[in-house]
Amino acid sequence: MAHYSYLDSNSVVVTVTVGKDETELINGLDTETYYAQGTPYTVKRTSYNTYGGVHSGGGVPFRKNYASIGYTYDTERDAFIAPKPYPSWVLDEATCLWGAPVARPSEGLWLWDEATLSWIKR
């Protein structure tokens, strides 16, 4: 079993479905091509075991992150990237995850405050 994301014309994920294993051909077509047939979407396989470029089961990470609705597929990075949570946050190229411009304190619960560009203790 594998998971497939459907991308609109802006490469934004509109849905994610379960399908046949990616190593199988269906009617002579690779699975991404097969599932895209008859739709206005581009289909890209995604792995629910991959987050931040790491495979949770120790396997090979795939496309940096599991695709979710609203994520963007970046063809240059071959990665799924979440929407940017705050204007000041920066994309980590290695993980394709967004990070605050200031490191979060390690102890306690903190919320990001975009107005002050700092962490506020909860």
Feature map (PLM): residue ranges:
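Interaction-interface detector
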Residues: 1-122
